[in-house]
Amino acid sequence: MIEETLLEAEEKMDKAVEVAKEDFASIRTGRANPGLYNRVLVDYYGSPTPLQQLASFAIPDARTILITPFDKTALRDIERALSDSEVGANPSNDGNVIRITIPELTKERRKEYVKIVKTKGEDAKVSIRNIRRKAKEALDRLVKDGEAGEDEGTRAEKELDGLTKAHVDGIDELLKRKEAELLEV
């Protein structure tokens, strides 16, 4: 039971780190990055469809993204979804591909994005700590109910603390990299 509890906690912590990575990727840095559009949904034949399923991405230079739809009839729908997205893109359509030029970020905008990244990072850390708290409660219950010994419970708690620290450190590392990326001119 202890191993299952630890394994479940680790899986949930890994998921929290993955969500943080996706959140960080969706924040633009003034550099072309297809990850900006991971959450864009296109109304394709009446059904919201992720952009990655409808088109391929190419990055010809540091500030341009070319989006080539697999189905040319979806070009207008994709362009509309990009215009409506929170990314702040101005797509131009030449009939075959959609070209997006990423504008340079102002100093104020960069600082704003750093604050957003820090908030998302802190949310991820809180999520990891909540997972730790729930796992610790489950471990304490196992010891209390006599399903595990005191020594096993203490060892498992130390292992849980190690997992928590490793995942929080992982978030901190992601945070540092994204901050450096944002502040780089």
UniProtKB/Swiss-Prot annotation:
Species the sequence originates in: Pseudarthrobacter chlorophenolicus (strain ATCC 700700 / DSM 12829 / CIP 107037 / JCM 12360 / KCTC 9906 / NCIMB 13794 / A6)
A single Gene Ontology CC term: cytoplasm
Protein name: Ribosome-recycling factor
Gene Ontology BP, a term: translational termination
Gene3D superfamilies: 3.30.1360.40, Ribosome-recycling factor
Locations listed in the record: Cytoplasm
HAMAP family in UniProt: RRF
Single Gene Ontology MF annotation: ribosomal large subunit binding
Function: Responsible for the release of ribosomes from messenger RNA at the termination of protein biosynthesis. May increase the efficiency of translation by recycling ribosomes from one round of translation to another.
Keywords from the UniProt entry: Cytoplasm, Protein biosynthesis
InterPro entries the record matches: Ribosome_recyc_fac, Ribosome_recyc_fac_dom, RRF_sf
CDD domains xref list: RRF
Family the UniProt entry places it in: Belongs to the RRF family.
